[in-house]
Design a protein with these regions (language model features):
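Amide-donor transfer/coupling interface in amidating biosynthetic enzymes
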Residues: 1-135
Length: 135
């Protein structure tokens, strides 16, 4: 259900960004660079960053198709981070899972050995808590 793999898919849950649809020679036409993302409170993303507005680095041309967003939210998917300017889904979570967080951006591009990305720290912390019952 992704137009990245099947451009004639009946249900393009993941679809090419509208700004990319008319471009024939894709080349370096991706959404590249650092973009703002607004987080909702009481989410794993917010708990990880400790703030409502973040900036993260991107390298892609496909996005969650907002046409399907409410259907996923009705089944328990939490859209915890969005780019308000373009109305793009940036982070999703499954609230009932100990730590299911998926991002559209690349947190590894802002992580360093001596300064791990907030999402990586949070993920490792959740793994330790799951195994040992505490941090």
């Amino acid at each position: 259900n992704s137009s990245e793999f099947d451009d004639k898919t009946k249900y393009p849950v993941i679809d090419i960004m509208s700004s990319q649809k008319k471009i024939k020679k894709k080349g370096a036409t991706m959404r590249l660079g650092s973009y703002g993302c607004n987080l909702i409170g009481k989410s794993k993303a917010y708990e990880s960053y400790g703030k409502r507005k973040i900036n993260e680095r991107h390298r892609h041309r496909f996005e969650v198709n907002n046409k399907y967003r409410s259907k996923f939210e009705a089944k328990g998917l939490v859209v915890s981070g969005t780019n308000k300017e373009l109305n793009l889904v940036e982070i999703v979570e499954i609230k009932s899972h100990p730590w299911f967080v998926a991002t559209q951006f690349h947190p590894e591009l802002k992580s360093r050995v001596v300064n791990a990305h907030p999402l990586f720290k949070s993920f490792v912390g959740a793994c330790i808590k799951q195994k040992y019952g505490h941090l």
